[in-house]
């Protein structure tokens, strides 16, 4: 299930994005400041390039590129 990012509280969205950009394996030695990485993800969400996916089984949200999400989830 996709969660519209504009339906989340601003603080909740920020925490979700911060969790994503600070995970092991996502920085690849990137020294870009956290605020910059968060802003990049927000722009991707605003442009529709990224989406928030909710997994009912694990009760967790994940960020994903829209192109990587099954087409049937986008309908």
Curated annotation (Swiss-Prot):
> Which HAMAP family did the record assign?
UPF0270
Pfam families named in the record: UPF0270
Which InterPro entries has this protein been placed in?
UPF0270, YehU-like_sf
User: What NCBIfam families does the entry give?
Assistant: PRK00304.1
Q: Which family does it belong to?
A: Belongs to the UPF0270 family.
Instruction: Tell me the organism.
Output: Stutzerimonas stutzeri (strain A1501)
What is the protein name stated in its UniProt record?
UPF0270 protein PST_1436
Kindly give the Gene3D superfamilies that the UniProt entry links to this protein. Answer: YehU-like
Output the superkingdom of the source species. Answer: Bacteria
């Amino acid at each position: 299930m996709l969660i519209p990012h504009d339906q989340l509280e601003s603080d909740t969205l920020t925490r979700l994005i911060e969790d994503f950009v600070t995970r092991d394996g996502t920085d690849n030695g990137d020294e870009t400041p956290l605020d910059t990485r968060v802003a990049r993800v927000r722009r991707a969400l605003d442009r529709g390039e990224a989406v928030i996916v909710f997994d009912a089984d694990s009760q967790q949200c994940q960020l994903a590129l829209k192109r990587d999400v099954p087409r049937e989830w986008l309908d």
